[in-house]
Swiss-Prot record:
GO annotation, cellular component aspect: cytosol
Protein's UniProt name: Putative thymidine phosphorylase
Pfam families with a match to the protein in the record: Glycos_trans_3N, Glycos_transf_3, PYNP_C
Catalytic activity: thymidine + phosphate = 2-deoxy-alpha-D-ribose 1-phosphate + thymine
Enzyme category, top tier: transferase
Keyword Repeat: no
EC number(s) reported in the record: 2.4.2.4
Keywords noted in UniProt: Glycosyltransferase, Transferase
Entry's Gene Ontology BP terms: pyrimidine nucleobase metabolic process; pyrimidine nucleoside metabolic process
Family under the similarity heading: Belongs to the thymidine/pyrimidine-nucleoside phosphorylase family. Type 2 subfamily.
Length: 513
């Protein structure tokens, strides 16, 4: 311990079993012997130090000595894990000066254009967890007002450089990304084994759900382990030409994960922030060719063709700057893709498509083939225009299913439950007619309310899509849940608004049987 630390008040670290998300939180007793709580008022920012190890945290004060004693400093689970010192270690606690990069955040809020070094400083502090959630929100709101092209490039570069940077000894490394917002839509899990079976390299890293009922990583986790580190990831790709793993475990663009955790609840999703998020991870992942799926629809993230064009140009601009060949494709975002919404239900759809099951969702199959065909066109040895036919050949021959099983075997077994929720309720059509609309956002909300993705077997199974004829009382979809209270909440919300429109009329409580 340094002489400076020794002169400061010392407290013993104690782990508090409290999940505070991404924010570092420390707790002291109001009767602390080493600190004066009246000086360290609640929600103060403090610096915790032991030797050369330091961390900023938000300080809370408790009157419960059973939680934190007078000689203790409690660290919530995320802070305890990041600080990396054993329970009982002595630490010093002092008021923390705000990160110097906050001056740049204030400048952005006031309308100033930031320099590349200023953006780099902000991203470095974000990645080191030196910002509170309120400070992160301030940066996001400032950036949402406007962002120049130079600021965007600087943000992509800074976010890609602070985490793991993967490099592959292969000339063509393909990737695909969907901007999200569409329930189901588990095309990556179908196209990765198709592309890998052909022989192209596709090391797919995916996210977990934040505000949706399932991310690709949540769904793949039903079939295989996804918390794979970099060395093991490279072994899997060497053996299988591809993988389907959780990106958070390989630490690609960690600052982006922190920004997303705050911007999603605030519904901040500007074009520039979206492009910076996606492109920073693809740059860090070592991708040479990227296909971006832009679903277009009234309840999708992209509503109009003009919005899609603007987003396409932004992706191409950033891709050109960093040497990544970017292609965007506009797809149908009017309704969910596949029949399942929720990890287990979506995994069932994927395996049905790969297994050429006649009952597999045709929309998921066709979209996956279309996207896979575009990726296969990046193979210089494949005749131009034959990508779709090659993708279909690999699927129908069983080669894609065999490759998926190889990926699953190499990633290892999962401990996740694969059973569906035991509590089920059918939501039925209010009248005879034709389904004329489906609200993606509402179905996402209903599936989450039912327990997905925490309960992987919770969610929604769709029986009807846009254009289907229905009779009064015929099931539109089934809600699956494990917990009675979650089932009750989901059913109540569905009765209030089912998310379906029949002959142009929304289904409300009085119309549901």
């Amino acid at each position: 311990m340094s002489p400076v630390d020794a002169a400061r008040p010392q407290l013993k670290i104690r782990q508090i079993h409290l999940d505070t998300g991404r924010e570092n939180v420390a707790v002291i007793s109001r009767h602390s012997k080493a600190l004066r709580p009246e000086v360290f008022s609640g929600f103060s920012r403090v610096e915790i130090r032991r030797g050369n190890q330091s961390m900023l945290a938000t300080l809370l004060i408790t009157d419960d000595n059973a939680m934190v004693g007078p000689d203790d400093l409690g660290l919530a689970e995320p802070a305890f894990r990041r600080f990396g010192e054993a329970a009982g270690s002595l630490v010093s606690v002092t008021p923390a000066s705000p990160p110097a990069s906050l001056d740049a955040v204030r400048g952005k809020i006031q309308g100033r254009t930031l320099t590349a070094p200023e953006i780099e400083a902000i991203v470095n502090d974000l990645a080191r967890y030196r910002y509170s959630d309120m400070e992160i929100a301030a940066f996001l709101i400032g950036a949402a007002r406007f962002m120049t092209s130079d600021e965007l490039l600087a943000l992509v570069s800074a976010m890609a450089s602070v985490g793991t940077q993967l490099r592959w000894d292969r000339p063509v490394v393909v990737d695909k990304h969907c901007i999200g917002g569409i329930p189901g839509n588990r095309t990556s899990m179908v196209l990765v084994p198709i592309v890998a079976a052909h022989g192209l390299t596709i090391p797919k890293t995916s996210s977990r759900a934040i505000t949706s009922p399932a991310g690709t990583a949540d769904t793949m986790e039903v079939l295989a382990r996804v918390d794979v580190g970099v060395p093991e990831m490279k072994e899997i790709v060497a053996a299988c030409n591809g993988c389907l793993i959780w990106g958070g475990h390989v630490n690609l663009s960690p600052a982006d994960d922190i920004l997303i955790s705050v911007e999603r609840p605030l519904c901040l999703d500007t074009r520039e922030q979206m492009v910076a998020s996606i492109m920073s991870k693809k740059l860090a992942a070592g991708s040479t060719h990227l296909l971006v799926d832009l679903p277009l629809g009234p309840s999708a993230k992209v509503i109009s063709p003009i919005d899609a064009m603007r987003l396409r140009k932004l992706f191409e601009f950033v891709g050109d700057h960093f040497g990544i060949a970017v292609e965007t494709i506009t797809t149908d975002g009017r309704q969910p893709i596949g029949n399942g919404i929720g990890p287990v239900l979506e995994a069932q759809d994927v395996m049905a498509v790969l297994g050429n099951d006649p009952k597999a969702p045709a929309d998921l199959r066709e979209k996956s083939l279309r996207l896979a065909g575009h990726l296969l066109e990046y193979d210089p040895n494949l005749r131009g225009g034959s990508g779709y036919a090659r993708a279909r050949e690999l699927l129908e021959s069983g080669a894609a299913l065999k490759q998926m099983q190889k990926i699953i075997d190499n990633q290892g077994p999962t401990n996740c439950r694969k059973d569906l929720g035991t509590l089920t309720t059918d939501i039925v059509a209010p009248r005879d007619g034709v389904v004329t609309g489906i609200d993606n956002l509402q179905l996402n909300r209903l599936a989450r309310t039912a327990g997905a993705p925490i309960d992987k077997g919770a969610g929604i199974k769709l029986f009807k899509k846009v254009g289907d004829r229905v009779e009064q009382g015929e099931p539109l979809y089934r809600i699956y849940a494990f917990d009675p209270s979650e089932q009750e909440l989901a059913v109540s919300a569905a009765e209030e608004s089912s998310g379906y429109t029949v002959d142009g009329v929304h289904a409300f409580r009085e119309q549901v049987l």
